[in-house]
Each structure stands twice: as structure tokens, then as C-alpha cells.
């Protein structure tokens, strides 16, 4: 997966710069999200990998399937990807584009998992605390997982803060066994 992101990064960065300069970041994010979700469908994925179809046919087919969101620049981007045999990178390009978008907006997606459901006040306090610590606007997604026993696990990008009882027990067991 890391290799895919390495190859996808220049494409995502280039398309993000174009979108930013033209003020169409949201439109490009939506378009890339739809294109990425469509390209993982097994039948379409097989067709896009079929060497019997030309790059132009593949790009046009994908643009037609996603006609509601695909712009002329989007079609040109798809053609460039198809010519370079990079249509399979669309999910990674979309994910990286979203990261660039969040960074540009000084925002971050945070996944918060707790053993018990938090109240609205606790959730707001957590979001405010994380926003201050990360110096970003926080888009908080929360879920409960009773297997944590107690405490919380916070994930954002590569940062994971494991304050769960399960995590502490695992660390203790590792220390005892080593």
C-alpha cells in the first residue's frame, strides 16, 4: 500500500494544486471519491485492466460511468492516468487528495474509540482538547468497543494514542514476557 501511495502522490499533488488554484477543491474531492469507489468494483476493475481496450476507451468509459461528477478537466486527468496505466491508482489518489485538502483547510479526521459511549459534553470537550493540541479543526468520529475494557483509543493519520485498559494490559503482558 505504501508503494501505491508513493506512485500516486505526484498525481494527487498535481491535481490538488490545479483544484486549489481554480477554487474547485470540493468538486475535485467529490469527483475523485466517486471515481475511486467505482474503480474498485470487480467488473469495471477487470475491464479497466483489459489490454484489448485503448487508454482512451478506458478513460471515456470511466468518465461515462461517473458522468454526473466528471468535468472536462477530470476527463483529461483520467486520460492521462489511462495512458500511463495508472487508473488503478485512483483510490490512493483520492485518499491523498483528501489528506492534502484537510491539510489545506487546517483540519484533521480523528477516530475516537471508547469502551463506553460518551455524552455530548464529553465528546465536545474531547474535540476541543484535540483541536487545541493538534492546532487544527477536528472532524471527530466516535464509536464504542466494549473489548477495550476501559479508556480510549484515538487515531488520526499515523498518530495512535492508546489509553485503553486492553492496550495497557497488552503492554504489561509484553513486558512480563520479555
Curated annotation (Swiss-Prot):
> Which domain of life does this protein belong to?
Bacteria
Q: How does it sit in the membrane?
A: Peripheral membrane protein
Any single Gene Ontology cellular-component annotation: plasma membrane
> A GO molecular-function term, please?
proton-transporting ATP synthase activity, rotational mechanism
InterPro entries membership: ATP_synth_OSCP/delta_N_sf, ATPase_OSCP/d_CS, ATPase_OSCP/dsu
Q: Which Pfam families match?
A: OSCP
Compartments where found: Cell inner membrane
Q: What keywords appear on the UniProt entry?
A: ATP synthesis, Cell inner membrane, Cell membrane, CF(1), Hydrogen ion transport, Ion transport, Membrane, Transport
- The principal localisation class reads membrane
Q: Which Gene3D superfamilies match?
A: N-terminal domain of the delta subunit of the F1F0-ATP synthase
Q: Tell me, how does this one assemble?
A: F-type ATPases have 2 components, F(1) - the catalytic core - and F(0) - the membrane proton channel. F(1) has five subunits: alpha(3), beta(3), gamma(1), delta(1), epsilon(1). F(0) has three main subunits: a(1), b(2) and c(10-14). The alpha and beta chains form an alternating ring which encloses part of the gamma chain. F(1) is attached to F(0) by a central stalk formed by the gamma and epsilon chains, while a peripheral stalk is formed by the delta and b chains.
Q: What does this protein do?
A: F(1)F(0) ATP synthase produces ATP from ADP in the presence of a proton or sodium gradient. F-type ATPases consist of two structural domains, F(1) containing the extramembraneous catalytic core and F(0) containing the membrane proton channel, linked together by a central stalk and a peripheral stalk. During catalysis, ATP synthesis in the catalytic domain of F(1) is coupled via a rotary mechanism of the central stalk subunits to proton translocation. This protein is part of the stalk that links CF(0) to CF(1). It either transmits conformational changes from CF(0) to CF(1) or is implicated in proton conduction.
Into which family does the record put it? Belongs to the ATPase delta chain family.
Q: This chain belongs to which protein, by name?
A: ATP synthase subunit delta
Amino acid at each position: 500500500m505504501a508503494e501505491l501511495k508513493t506512485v500516486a502522490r505526484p498525481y494527487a499533488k498535481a491535481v490538488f494544486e490545479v483544484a486549489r488554484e481554480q477554487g474547485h477543491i470540493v468538486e475535485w474531492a467529490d469527483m475523485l471519491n466517486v471515481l475511486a469507489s467505482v474503480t474498485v468494483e470487480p467488473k469495471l476493475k477487470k475491464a479497466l485492466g483489459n489490454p484489448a481496450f485503448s487508454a482512451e476507451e478506458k478513460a471515456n468509459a470511466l468518465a461515462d460511468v461517473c458522468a454526473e461528477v466528471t468535468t472536462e478537466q477530470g476527463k483529461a486527468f483520467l486520460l492521462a492516468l489511462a495512458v500511463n496505466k495508472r487508473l488503478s491508482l485512483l483510490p490512493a489518489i483520492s485518499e491523498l487528495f483528501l489528506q492534502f485538502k484537510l491539510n489545506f483547510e487546517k483540519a484533521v479526521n480523528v477516530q475516537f474509540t471508547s469502551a463506553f459511549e460518551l455524552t455530548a459534553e464529553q465528546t465536545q470537550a474531547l474535540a476541543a482538547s484535540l483541536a487545541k493540541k493538534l492546532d487544527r479543526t477536528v472532524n471527530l468520529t466516535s464509536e464504542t468497543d466494549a473489548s477495550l475494557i476501559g479508556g480510549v483509543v484515538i487515531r488520526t493519520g499515523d498518530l495512535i494514542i492508546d489509553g485503553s485498559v486492553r492496550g495497557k494490559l497488552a503492554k504489561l503482558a509484553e513486558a512480563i514476557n520479555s
